[in-house]
Amino acid sequence: PSRASLHTGLYACNHRSVTNGTPLDSRHTNLALELRKAGIEPLLYGYSDTSVDPRRVHAQDPSLDTFESILPGFKSVVDYNLGYLEGWLNWLEDQGYERPDPSESVFHHSPEKITAGRFCDEPAFYAAEHSDTAYLTHHACHTIRNYHNEDWFIHLSVLRPHPPLIAPAPYNRLYNWRDLPLPERGSSLKNDAAMHPLLELWQEKIDTEDYFGSQANMLRLCDEDILRAKAVYLGLITEVDKNLGTIFDLLKKTGSGMKL
């Protein structure tokens, strides 16, 4: 919903793409289409998570099976989302890593690091300079360096700090979990669920040991592990900040930052 609002300039009550999978009405123009009217080809690095208008495609069109389509108007340069990891995994191979199999295990800790029922905040097997965030940043910077006096537009859409909650060193333990506050909550899961039907439904949904590849039941973590997970989340935010700084520094170095 927020992404659709960003792309269209409309409130969710107007564009009505209010959940992942809710189609975005094709009658709405968007940022990418308007940029094309100005003679600029908008480039996408990452994902736009757009659900196509089913009235504009055949009933058997594969795009109807996903909410991870590209927003009309964008040229996808580097495609990356949880449903498509191949580009990043190929890049990891180029950096000398063994390719994870299956693909989603790139976000898993090795079995010897896992304690049953506990959240694991050990570092990912890849270095910070090879993370999914760094992968998108690297390719976006490569493109920026090739622009000189022409107009350009890049939409860099990184996944993080979205789960899976696993981070490369030092971001996995950049924040001390002991310094963090516990979330505001009821006295028990049962009491929380009784507050609203949505909370009850949500508890049922996440009552699993594979919610976003977490390798632990995120609903039933002890207080310490809740804070460890929170610390990893904050670390992922800081990792994004660091990579944005890399881009801003490049813009200053190339002079592009003066034109934004």
Model-derived segments and their meaning:
Residues 1-260:
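Formylglycine-dependent sulfatase
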